[in-house]
Amino acid sequence: MGGCNHPIRLGTLCGVCGMEIQEESHLFCALYNTDNVKITHEEAVAIHKEKMEALEMQMKLILVLDLDQTVLHTTYGTSSLEGTVKFVIDRCRYCVKLRPNLDYMLRRISKLYEIHVYTMGTRAYAERIVEIIDPSGKYFDDRIITRDENQGVLVKRLSRLFPHDHRNIVILDDRPDVWDYCENLVLIRPFWYFNRVDINDPLRLKRKIEKEAGENKALEEFVSKRKKIEDIRNPEIASRLDDMVLESSCGSEGVEDDSRSTEEKEVSEVQSVASGDSELLKVAGFLRKVHRKYFASKQRNVKRILRKIRRRVFGGDRFFVAEIANRAWLVKTIEMYGGIVGIPESGVDFVVSSCEREAEYLAQKFECLAVSPKWIADCVYSLKRVEYGKYVVCDHRTKDEYEEELERLFT
């Protein structure tokens, strides 16, 4: 490496001797709050092994925790609703609702897991949120990584946090796609309170970045507005115009206005469901179960434990998924939880469709049950095969299959 064997890099410079390192090598981001400081992969693995051994001695696992829709819901703008927290970053207003039982879960789980926050929000946003849910720093310390330090990508990877050996790491997130359906993932039902908008949705952020990249004209107009503001001598007028420009830029992010009143009924329904949310209580119990199984096992591998639990959900059931909006999510999720998707030679057990006419046609064709996609979601979030009675769209099973099902249920 150009005559320098030191393990630390600051950009293209050695962090110890200052020598410029021209040739590239396999480096690892050493810190959470920046991706500019790196160490060699060998050094990272050595540090990681030492840390993992210390955690094993403490009988602790690692929990990588998402924020948005996992433990809270954030919207732009203000709200008069009780139990919400408001703050401002760069003149954009945010309103946050914490998921019920969050503090209980953190108190219980922090005794068994070292918790790391991994969010697609910005560094400023994440730090403000953490101040709200962990003001003393006892749960997260400085273990926070955001999209600002995520090496320019809008997906999450355990390799960004840990260079080696992920067998003792559990992920808690509402988005399996962001993790590319990683085997360490525990999926939680998304938490919605104000509306159904995820302000830090990676797909939305990607579209925004692509849009901004091609808006040179809009950028020029923005700069022009700023220049006019700077030319005005009256500070009160300048401040007001500045606010107008910022409101305009924040508007594309989803700042809500009086038009929200047209959605009051839907929002009220979402809040009614959210107020009775008990998902974090269930998750706390499940994470304790995983912890117990891990330290009782000789192999000690979280992925193996989670894989076994997940595959019991659909346990070899055969599915045909219709062409619907969220088909990719359904197919990958069904397979991840032990189902078989396609048209196996042995037949089909379930057709999944939200269209009644299509479900009727396919169920007749395959002589099987047709269920709504909601059944798949509820099974996955419950980590068990829930009774499908209320999710059935139509039933075209043969008599023999129907009698076998009755026998299974009542014997």
Curated annotation (Swiss-Prot):
The active site is at 66, 68. It catalyses: O-phospho-L-seryl-[protein] + H2O = L-seryl-[protein] + phosphate; O-phospho-L-threonyl-[protein] + H2O = L-threonyl-[protein] + phosphate. InterPro entries: BRCT_dom, BRCT_dom_sf, Fcp1, FCP1_dom, FCP1_euk, HAD-like_sf, HAD_sf. It is found in: Nucleus. PROSITE patterns: BRCT, FCP1. Processively dephosphorylates 'Ser-2' and 'Ser-5' of the heptad repeats YSPTSPS in the C-terminal domain of the largest RNA polymerase II subunit (RPB1). This promotes the activity of RNA polymerase II. This is RNA polymerase II subunit A C-terminal domain phosphatase. It comes from Encephalitozoon cuniculi (strain GB-M1) (Microsporidian parasite). The gene is FCP1.
